[in-house]
């Protein structure tokens, strides 16, 4: 009997030790999770404070040394507004950590668990030193691709559209692109393959003054259009090319030109006075963004959406040979006439 009681007591002691061990593990686990959450909130609070102080410092420097970029009456407000601009992602993250901080305080009952101590604040200079560590050429690439209208490519596309295409193409006083093309067809008894202005955008960005092709011949241009622009009666001209090889027994003409801003950018890249390594490194991003933004402007504006045909292409084929623009147009017309024949048939 006594032996059985001793065995039972030993079993109880073992059970108690097991429960105590589980309790200790559970306690340490909860403490570890609580400390992790508290330290995470402290680190985030330290980073936010360091960022705020950095923005404040830059605001002071901007106010003192860059006053010429602001109007006197709203200089302070504009600088503060710009310095306190945060992305939506940053705002949501900070709000999330603030919520986590309040939850931590509600559990522990001690606000000191989430307030940064001097040990954390002492690391703020590291943020100031390494805050630009994440910047790279990829950062510039992402910035160029964003839709803000401030990059080189979007600026070229906007100037090209608002200063040229939007002025010369729409119909105003019987001088729009379609009217001039119809007059041209009647006058010379020809047919345009595409009743739009074709704009070539090769990735090489270079286009000769006369578009080179084995099967393209330069013809008489469309009638010159004169438009008053900023006090100057500017002439607007559109070149016309004849496809030397017939498609289904018919000769086609095309109003066609290269994207002049791309040619200007090509020249800027190869000039010792204006070229930068960033321009050369990101030229493909600029080329694609120019096309994307210009296409968006053309499609958005009602007067131009059906008047322009953008052709973006690689200047060289897989063998390294120059792509023949005339061959591209011929293939396009062959496909177009084939589809029409199939519809009729």
Swiss-Prot record:
3',2'-cGAMP binds at residues 159, 234, 237, 257, 260, 264. It is a multi-pass membrane protein. Keywords: Antiviral defense, Endoplasmic reticulum, Glycoprotein, Immunity, Innate immunity, Membrane, Nucleotide-binding, Transmembrane, Transmembrane helix. Glycans are attached at residues 88, 189, 272. Belongs to the STING family. This is Stimulator of interferon genes protein homolog. Signal peptide: none annotated. Facilitator of innate immune signaling that binds cyclic dinucleotides produced in response to infection by bacteria and/or viruses, and promotes the activation of the NF-kappa-B transcription factor Rel (Relish). Recognizes and binds cyclic di-GMP (c-di-GMP), a cyclic dinucleotide messenger produced by bacteria such as L.monocytogenes, leading to activation of the peptidoglycan recognition protein (IMD) signaling pathway and activation of Rel (Relish). One of its GO terms (cellular component) is endoplasmic reticulum membrane. It is found in: Endoplasmic reticulum membrane. The keyword Glycoprotein applies. GO terms for biological process: activation of innate immune response; autophagosome assembly; defense response to virus; innate immune response; positive regulation of macroautophagy; positive regulation of peptidoglycan recognition protein signaling pathway; positive regulation of type I interferon production; reticulophagy. The chain crosses the membrane at residues 90-107, 122-144. It comes from Drosophila eugracilis. GO terms for molecular function: 2',3'-cyclic GMP-AMP binding; 3',2'-cyclic GMP-AMP binding; cyclic-di-GMP binding. The keyword Endoplasmic reticulum applies. InterPro entries: STING (IPR029158), STING_C (IPR033952), STING_C_sf (IPR038623), STING_LBD (IPR055432), STING_TM (IPR055434). Pfam families: STING_LBD, STING_TM.
């Amino acid at each position: 009997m006594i032996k059985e009681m001793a065995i039972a007591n030993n079993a109880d002691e073992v059970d108690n030790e097991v429960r105590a061990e589980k309790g200790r593990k559970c306690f340490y686990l909860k403490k570890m999770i609580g400390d992790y959450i508290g330290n995470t909130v402290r680190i985030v609070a330290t980073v936010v404070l360091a960022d705020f102080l950095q923005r404040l410092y830059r605001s002071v420097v901007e106010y003192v040394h860059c006053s010429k970029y602001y109007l006197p009456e709203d200089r302070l407000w504009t600088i503060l507004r710009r310095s306190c601009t945060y992305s939506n992602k940053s705002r949501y993250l900070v709000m999330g950590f603030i919520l986590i901080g309040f939850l931590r305080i509600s559990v522990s009952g001690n606000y000191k668990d989430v307030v940064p101590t001097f040990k954390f604040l002492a690391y703020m200079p590291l943020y100031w030193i390494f805050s630009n560590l994440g910047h790279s050429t990829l950062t510039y690439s992402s910035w160029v691709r964003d839709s803000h209208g401030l990059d080189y490519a979007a600026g070229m596309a906007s100037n090209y559209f608002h200063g040229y295409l939007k002025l010369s193409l729409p119909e105003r006083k019987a001088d729009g692109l379609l009217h001039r093309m119809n007059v041209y067809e009647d006058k010379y008894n020809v047919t345009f393959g595409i009743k739009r202005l074709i704009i070539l955008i090769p990735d090489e960005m270079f286009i000769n003054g006369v578009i080179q092709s084995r099967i393209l011949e330069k013809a008489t241009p469309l009638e010159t259009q004169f438009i008053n622009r900023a006090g100057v009666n500017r002439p607007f001209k559109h070149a016309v090319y004849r496809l030397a090889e017939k498609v289904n027994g018919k000769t086609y003409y095309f109003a066609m030109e290269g994207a002049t801003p791309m040619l200007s950018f090509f020249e800027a890249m190869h000039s010792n006075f204006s070229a930068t390594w960033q321009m050369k490194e990101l030229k493909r991003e600029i080329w694609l963004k120019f096309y994307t933004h210009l296409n968006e402007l053309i499609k958005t504006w009602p007067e131009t959406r059906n008047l322009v045909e953008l052709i973006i292409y690689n200047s060289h084929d897989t063998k390294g040979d120059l792509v023949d623009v005339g061959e591209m147009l011929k293939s396009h017309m062959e496909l177009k006439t084939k589809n029409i024949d199939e519809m009729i048939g």
